[in-house]
Amino acid sequence: MSNPTKSDGTQWGVMWVAFGGGIIAACHLGKLPPALPLIMRELDAGLVMGGWIASMISFTGFALGLISGTIGDRIGQRFVLVIGLLTIAAGSLIGAFAVSANAMLLSRFIEGIGFSASTVAGAGIITHVTSTKDRKWALGVWSSYVPIGFAGMLIGSALILGISDWRTLWLANAMLTVFWAALAFFVTNGWRRRGARGGGDKLLYNVITCFKQRGACLVAACFAMYAAQHISMMAWLPTYMRETYDASTLLAAAVPAIILLFNAGGNWMSAWAMGRAMPSWCLLFAGALGMGITQLGVFSGSIGEGARLGCALLFGIFGGMIPAAAVGSVAVYTPAPSQIGTMNGLMVMGTNAGMLFGPPAMATVRAGTGAWSEVIWLVASMAGVGVVLSLITRPMERNANSE
């Protein structure tokens, strides 16, 4: 693919603000797990409904991820990033005043629209403002926005919930997001990506062209398998710890936060490896296999607590290898610079598909069997699919690199 940067140099200020926008968006994922039991109790929501509340922010990402990327290619990622962040803030504000489970679902749906828009736009901006030399590293850094934002807000949520209620938490997140939207608006003022033109008929053309890249579609599916396992673990681990170990709210939030920091470490390790010419399929394969093996330990009833914690931390590292590899593959499979946003949208659609069905699937298995150990077969199956998909992409990636 030809160089999509606006200039020969990397525009670091714009890059870091876009990265921060992704972190702020991910905070709205991390605010939920510590508050979910309180929300379920106050809004009279069952376990399965709680799973859908956890996943609803991903529904629109699945449905609109590709469209968000294509629109970003058409009207500019800067505009989409700012509007996306403001939409997240609006959804959080509505959620702060929710009086029923359905109202909370609506607020998470609105947050999902903004999450999809801002994260697709953020990746597109970073791709355009980085030089060829810096791009793989920058995209690897970008892939850590979810674990950093998620982990930070897990701890922040637990602290806020210790002195106030979940509605205050939602309001605080809304204000933080509005602040970053304003910052992004001013810092990116005057930046315009090269080639930001095209007609409405090109939107459909970009979508069709990206879907024709079979390797990219399989990478997105592998990303979905990762996301289903990862978000399920993060969404339900606090509940699991409370039920199994009678953990406090702060401790139940701290352990997932530590796992997420290890996940971010996996992101950066993967970015380092890609910068040294390791193919994406190798990282996808190692990550999927490692996630499957370590989850057997996390949910096993036959090993000690220390060993379970060790498996959970390794789960974070192996899982972190996949997002960086998937995002990095965008530069491999995108046919033209004008389609970067659309291809990023395909990856966002994939990860949100996994985030959508993962938590409800795990909750359904847990509710039906009455034991967390029974979810082993569900997560092992997801990991197995990811392993197979990664192997299938091997020749496709080699062919794409040779073009």
Predicted region positions:
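Juxtamembrane intracellular "pre-TM" segments in multi-pass secondary transporters
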Residues: 2-8, 191-219
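Extracytoplasmic gate region of multi-pass secondary transporters
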Residues: 33, 215-257, 264
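Helix-breaking motifs and short loop linkers at transmembrane-helix boundaries and internal kinks
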Residues: 44, 76, 97-103, 131, ...
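Conserved MFS/SLC helix-loop-helix module at the cytosolic interface between two early adjacent transmembrane helices
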Residues: 63-99
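Helix-to-loop junctions at the C-terminal end of transmembrane segments
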Residues: 65-76, 267-279
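Cytoplasmic helix-loop-helix junction between adjacent transmembrane helices
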Residues: 107-146
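Helix-loop-helix hairpin linking two adjacent transmembrane segments in secondary transporters
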Residues: 132, 141-189
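C-terminal transmembrane helical hairpin of 12-TM major facilitator-type secondary transporters
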Residues: 280-326
